[in-house]
Amino acid sequence: MLTMRYVEKKVEQLPVARSLSIWWADRQSAAWRRRNPGKSFSDYYVDHVRRHLDRGKPHPTLGQVGFTHETGTGIDWDRANFAIRGRNAWREYRAAGVEPQMRIVDYGCGSLRVGQHAIRFADRGNYWGLDVAETFIEQGRRLVDPQLLEDKRPRLSAITERLIDLVAVWEPHFIFSHTVIQHVPEDELPLYFARLAKMMGPGCKAVIEFISAPRTKRIKAMSWAYSEARLRAAALSVDPSWSISIEDVADGTSQVMKKPRRVMILERD
C-alpha cells in the first residue's frame, strides 16, 4: 500500500527536488546563523530537528514518533516497541570486539536507539552517551526502561569541550558513532575528528559508520556521503598517529537512507 512517506521518499530522489531542498536548507541556515552569530551549520541542524520533534512530527531515527519502516506509516514509540529498535546496528558494533567490562562511548547517541542495547550490554557505569542536543537524549530517557537506567547507571551528556575533556579522563576503551558523520558538513569534519582524538587514549578503538560514495556528495538537505579517501584525509589531518581501516558492514546499506555504507575503524596503539 502506498503511504505518504513512500511518496515523499520517491519525490526526494528526484534530482530537482534534492537540489531545491538543499538550496532551501542553505537559505534557512544562512538566515538562522545571521540571527545566531558564531553558530555552525550543525547547530542549525540541531535546532531544526528539535523544532520538528517539538511539533510532534515523525523522524526516522530521533524522538518519540517515527515510522514503521523506511516508507511506512507513522508510529508512536513506547517502551515496548522502542526496545527492539537499533538491535541489528548494535550487533555490528558488538562484532567489532567490544566487551561488557570496557568503558564504552556512544558518540552521537541521539535518542538511544542503538545506545539502549549498549547500556544493556555494558557493565554498570560503563556506558557514556554523548550528543549535541540534550533534548534528543531526554526523549531517549523517556523511552528506555527506567529499571535498566537504574540498574546500569549510564552517563548521558550534551557535548561541550569541557565534557570531551572529562570523557578523555575517563579513558574509554571503545567508541562508536552510528549515523552521525553523515550529518556533519565537510568543513566541520576537523571538529568531529578533533573531539574523537581527544577522547581516545592508548588502546582505544573507534568505529564510525558512514554513507559511502566515490567522492563527497550531499545526498539530502542535511546529509552527506563521503569517500574513504576523504575521511582518511580528514582524520589523519587531525591525528597522523591513528591506524585506520575501512570495512563493509553486514547488510551493506544504510537502514535509514538505503545508501551504501561502510565503517571506519580508528585505533591507537
Regions found by a protein language model. Give the residues of each.
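Short catalytic micro-motifs in class I SAM-dependent methyltransferases
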Residues: 179-180
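Active-site charged/polar residues at nucleotide-handling catalytic sites that mediate phosphoryl
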Residues: 170
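A conserved beta-strand element that flanks and buttresses the S-adenosyl-L-methionine
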Residues: 176
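Conserved acidic residues
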Residues: 173
